[in-house]
Amino acid sequence: MPSVGRVVATLAVVAGITACQPHPVATAPLPVSPATSSAAAPTASALQMLLVITDDWDAVPGVMRRFERDGVRSVWRPVGSDIAVVVGGAGLGWGDGLHGTGSPNEPGPIKQEGDNRSPAGVFRLTSAFGYAPRDSMSWITMPYAQATDAYKCVDDAASIHYNQMLFRQPGSAVDWRSAEDMHRRDSLYRMGVVVEHNANGQRVGAGSCIFLHIWPGAAGNTSGCTAFSSDAMNALLAWLKPESLPILVQLPRSEYDRLRALWGLPAITHSDRP
């Protein structure tokens, strides 16, 4: 998805992404194609990985681990300790990412707009955002956008700007009924990372505006994002490097077990799991 600003009418579009708040639901059925053999190793080019495992498709709590490697043929090694996370209130559903579109030839829920599921699969982590100005966040090496009051993420599937992040210029006309305010009145988006699910909104109604962000607490949930503590977010943003092509791998335990070898995922022990 594009991460460089461009002007569309009177709107400055910053990035195409995927939403973490309730939003309009697509009314037409979504075409879904199984992932093909080209997606057999969706982790192949990454040198940094976030691995999120939940108990099952409907579970909300999960565990996130960081991994890194020196080269694409090197062994993944763990970084830091386990991080408790929460996902969507309805659990996980197959998303659109590096693994392909929808399910890799297996049953399981399919992520759709407004279903309160976080996307399962493999996804690029493309950029960061937060309330603070860029010059005060020099320790973050990922592309970074300050979330001002003008910064929006369009989650209306009927909009031509669906699943895009943009700065809305004062007085500009809009073609959407729903968009997320990226500068919230709480701390949930104080720092966050964009997850490239359904890049550029190419599949209308497949889900939008998916982020890693600060959680409301261990007993909470999201509307489709993955959330964790502020301290963990600080550590993550200091660690992520764009040149390492970082990815998020997010799966229920059964799918991790089935896909670990095929996707080249690091081995974890039962003690590492939720």
Predicted regions span which residues?
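Short cysteine clusters
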Residues: 225
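Bacterial N-terminal signal peptides that target proteins for export
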Residues: 1-9
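C-terminal motif of bacterial Sec signal peptides marking the signal peptidase cleavage site
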Residues: 17-19
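Cell wall/extracellular polymer interaction/catalysis modules
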Residues: 30-222, 232-274
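Bacterial signal peptide processing site
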Residues: 21-23
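Conserved "landmark" site that anchors the functional core of diverse proteins
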Residues: 229
